[in-house]
Amino acid sequence: MSWTTPKKAIMLAAAAEGGTKLNAFDNALLKMGIGNVNLVKLSSVIPAHIEWLDELPKNIPIGMLLPTVYAHIESDEPGSTISAALGVGLSENNEGGLIYEYAGYCTKEEAEEMVRKMVEEGFKVRGWKLKEIKVISAEITVKDKPAAAVAAVVMFPY
């Protein structure tokens, strides 16, 4: 198997309910448009000169392997609010960046604040100059069905 350094990426987030916690997770992936591919979990480094997309590419093959950084949480506890967030830190001149993820029993604002702090620290310890932070999140309060919140950065080789 050969891997290619990703050239494009997109930030996505969604929350959904389902008959089980796993079905809720799957339904959130479907809402984001990535429910029929295989997500390959990555750690959190963004390649240099990546192009950020505003919408998913058309006709992604079913079963395609897509490098992805994602945060997720599922719950079946009625009344619980759950959130997932990703923070993307971009360096000066698009020379690379970092992605940090967080998911928990909290509001999306709390999750977003957590990933912002993580991005800032990640850049500081590397001695990199932070140009911009992008954040995406999803939140849901569990009602009578299991629920999931998912946030992802999906990368594409083309």
UniProtKB/Swiss-Prot annotation:
Domain of life (superkingdom): Archaea
Residues that bear Pyruvic acid (Ser): 44
Site (Cleavage (non-hydrolytic)): 43-44
Recorded catalytic activity of this chain's protein: L-arginine + H(+) = agmatine + CO2
This enzyme's EC code(s): 4.1.1.19
Cofactor binding remark: Binds 1 pyruvoyl group covalently per subunit.
CC cofactor: pyruvate
Sorted UniProt keywords: Decarboxylase, Lyase, Pyruvate
GO term, biological process aspect, one: arginine catabolic process
Pfam families the record matches: PvlArgDC (PF01862)
GO molecular function list: arginine decarboxylase activity
Recorded coiled-coil stretches: none
InterPro entries: Pyr-dep_his/arg-deCO2ase, Pyr-dep_his/arg-deCO2ase_sand, Pyruvoyl-dep_arg_deCO2ase
Transmembrane segments: none
Enzyme class: lyase
HAMAP family with a match to the protein in the record: PvlArgDC
Family: Belongs to the PdaD family.
The protein's name: Pyruvoyl-dependent arginine decarboxylase
Native organism: Pyrococcus abyssi (strain GE5 / Orsay)
Lineage of producing organism: Archaea, Methanobacteriati, Methanobacteriota, Thermococci, Thermococcales
Gene that produces this protein: pdaD
